[in-house]
Amino acid sequence: MHTQVAIIGAGPAGLFLSHLLYREGIACVVLEARSRAYVEDRVRAGVLEQGTVDLMHELGLDQRLRRECMIDEAIDIRFGNGKLIHVHFPELVAGRVVTIYGQQEVVKDLIAARIADGAPIQFEAEVTALEGLENDRPTIRYRKDGTEHTLTCDIVAGCDGFHGVCRPAIPDGVLTTYDHVFPFGWLGILSESPPIRETTYANHDRGFALCSRRSPKISRHYVQVAPDEDAANWSDDRFWNELHVRMNDGDRSEIVEGRIFQKGVTPVRAFVAAPMRYGRLFLAGDAAHIVPPTGAKGLNLAVADVRVLARALTQFFRGGSMERLDRYSDTCLRRVWKVVRYSWFMTSLLHRFPEHSVFERNIQLGELDYLLSSRAGRLTIAENYVGLPLEDE
């Protein structure tokens, strides 16, 4: 079997790319190692930048999103004894907002629409080899239902995540990787409880905390813990008690407790691989970069990658020009490093670092005090939070 673009991975990057290519009449096949149920049930972040929502609208895939989403017009940052930084997006960035809609819901919508279009997604198709990536007709070998299959293509899009097969298929010595692991993790829970009014971050002497929304009836909360912490050590009561303390909700009147139905520890790290291309293989999304969750950027950065890639592929298949493909990596990496910078800034601003001296702690609090009084400082947070403009228009 031959196709123009082989997309490895049916996460947000691969699925958005498949729809962008379908719109342009470019043939593609999506290969996903996991089952459809597994892919659709993975709970991930749910903060969508304006540009991501706009793309779903352009593709005609936003009907359920419009019915079920929530809109965040602001975030709050708490610190000290009751100090509050209110970052109101419409006031600071010309009416732009962020949308709360779970990544798993985005994935469900994208999969359903692709299947309705009659476009192929091969679930439980494990890629076993990528060959000829430096040639103009790469070969992909994959296993499905116990049978070996071969797919040839003109372009391979590596959208299979941090632990996928695409990035390791690039020969040694080609990639430079940048990796930074922070000295803490996030203990996160999902609970059946109405969420707090605004997405709220907290910098407390005992550590970072975050209260966020998933739906009108589901809350997503986090507290900073040691990177090797075991979630089993945290009873539900212990978690709620710690969250109330870090959010300065001493009278327990603001954060509503409910049944916790998911609990786990997430590492906090940044990772970038450069370049994001080798021959006819183009990396996108988590296959190329991981950002700390503090900035809520992972899905949105993946969408930005594939928008750039889709335009480059359209130019290539329509006119034979490699010009946009040749600058794909540089274009994407400029945005990637800006997003890593912002996520690093928010992470450094809001967490307690075990190695910090009293001097460094006071610098952190001084930065928060500056943001409290500076519109320019709040503007910097707002324009990054709602999403930077796409460069490769």
Where does each model-flagged region fall?
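Conserved mid-domain beta->alpha element of the FAD-binding
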Residues: A10-R23, L110, G158, G264-F345
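Conserved FAD-binding catalytic core of PHBH/FMO-like flavoproteins
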Residues: A112, A119, A125-A129, E134-G264, ...
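Generic enzyme active-site microenvironment
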Residues: V30-L31, G158, A202, A284
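Active-site-adjacent segment of FAD-dependent monooxygenases/related oxidoreductases
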Residues: D41-R44, E49-D117, E131
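Beta1/beta-strand and adjacent pyrophosphate-binding region of the FAD-binding site
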Residues: M1-A13
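C-terminal helical "tail/cap" subdomain of flavin- and related membrane-associated enzymes
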Residues: A296, R311-E393
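Glycine-rich FAD pyrophosphate-binding loop
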Residues: Y22-V43
